[in-house]
Amino acid sequence: MATAVVVNIGKKLYEGKTKEVYELLDTPGRVLLQSKDQITAGNAARKNHLEGKAAISNKITSCIFQLLQEAGIKTAFTKKCGETAFIAPQCEMIPIEWVCRRIATGSFLKRNPGVQEGYKFYPPKVEMFFKDDANNDPQWSEEQLIAAKFCFAGLVIGQTEVDIMSHATQAIFEILEKSWLPQDCTLVDMKIEFGVDVTTKEIVLADVIDNDSWRLWPSGDRSQQKDKQSYRDLKEVTPEGLQMVKKNFEWVADRVELLLKSDSQCRVVVLMGSTSDLGHCEKIKKACGNFGIPCELRVTSAHKGPDETLRIKAEYEGDGIPTVFVSVAGRSNGLGPVLSGNTAYPVISCPPITPDWGAQDVWSSLRLPSGIGCSTILSPEGSAQFAAQIFGLNNHLVWAKLRASILNTWISLKQADKKVRQCNL
């Protein structure tokens, strides 16, 4: 049950088919998005009251936005507000629906005769549609969007902004696709919208992502579809048909909270040869924390106490938690190779290189006997990232943070390039 939140609601700013947006008098720059108990299809050509849909939609959106925010995606979401609404930063909405597809189905097949249903896109295919109910939301090209010269909250939508939204759409889809896989659900396609935050002037994921926003097939089987397509496919809307649709929506709402957790545990154990390397190790631990990975620090020397080194190693091997060992040893690195030669777990050597003997010392981490498979990464942050990439193969939450980090790095470079180009004009 959501905690009751008292808000001072002002005027209605917008009303759509399935939601209303209100200003919040006590928090300038924030709005309330109120969902409706209404379901529509075909630009509201079909429209029905569906008791409980507002709460279902709000729960799904709140969980999905929380998942994306925690991954590092910039999202117009502050917190859930009761069962049927949430508070968000106020945005000026960009009137484009961004669609990302992994599997060809639905309208794509109608617009592209000859493509077989089930064709898979690698990478996912991104399309855009101008929000215009009177013209059935026509598909737009990138060139049309740029030529429109839209300006929202003072931000002109040009090539840079279009590229950012396109890349973000793909990243968001891939994160949600990966998140649904542990539930044995295939995310087939998805539509999202972006807005410009009126306070920060940044492009952010906005509006909602609920069961109207995607196609979701349990076990990859279209006949088991749980999304709004089950409503679109009704030849005639009957009370029984609506009840079936509601059960599908409830099925998704019951499982969406599971996306915020991972059944796959993970842990990084950093073994340092001396406490003089503690600062180097703390950087690794901090970087692991950015990926949500628990990290423990231990002190042991493979040269001076190999028996204790192997005992510590066995301690972590014995509790069943997937672990990556990171060895931090200066001068002659015996720690990483000894660990790697005596465990089936991944080992990363991250030696603290010094200016005087670093060029010579690093060879003890690089030139190793046969049968030793530890990698060497000099950057503390890089070693944590490599550990995250290992865990991300089976942990969707870690993978989501990695994917969002890639996107955010790309966006920062794109924005820096735009700023430099503007200075050169």
Curated annotation (Swiss-Prot):
Region (Linker) residue spans: 261-266
N6-acetyllysine: residues bearing it: K36, K247
GO molecular function, one term: phosphoribosylaminoimidazole carboxylase activity
Sites bearing Phosphotyrosine, chain numbering: Y22
Location of Phosphothreonine modifications: T238
Identification of the protein by name: Bifunctional phosphoribosylaminoimidazole carboxylase/phosphoribosylaminoimidazole succinocarboxamide synthetase
UniProt pathway: Purine metabolism; IMP biosynthesis via de novo pathway; 5-amino-1-(5-phospho-D-ribosyl)imidazole-4-carboxamide from 5-amino-1-(5-phospho-D-ribosyl)imidazole-4-carboxylate: step 1/2; Purine metabolism; IMP biosynthesis via de novo pathway; 5-amino-1-(5-phospho-D-ribosyl)imidazole-4-carboxylate from 5-amino-1-(5-phospho-D-ribosyl)imidazole (carboxylase route): step 1/1
GO cellular component labels: cytoplasm
Record Gene3D superfamilies: 3.40.50.1970, ATP-grasp fold, B domain, Phosphorylase Kinase, domain 1
SUPFAM superfamilies, A to Z: N5-CAIR mutase (phosphoribosylaminoimidazole carboxylase, PurE), SAICAR synthase-like
Self-association state and partner proteins as the record states: Homooctamer.
UniProt cross-references to HAMAP family, sorted A to Z: PurE_classII (MF_02045), SAICAR_synth (MF_00137)
Phosphoserine sites (modified residues): S107, S274
Chemical reaction(s) catalysed: 5-amino-1-(5-phospho-D-ribosyl)imidazole-4-carboxylate + L-aspartate + ATP = (2S)-2-[5-amino-1-(5-phospho-beta-D-ribosyl)imidazole-4-carboxamido]succinate + ADP + phosphate + 2 H(+); 5-amino-1-(5-phospho-D-ribosyl)imidazole-4-carboxylate + H(+) = 5-amino-1-(5-phospho-beta-D-ribosyl)imidazole + CO2
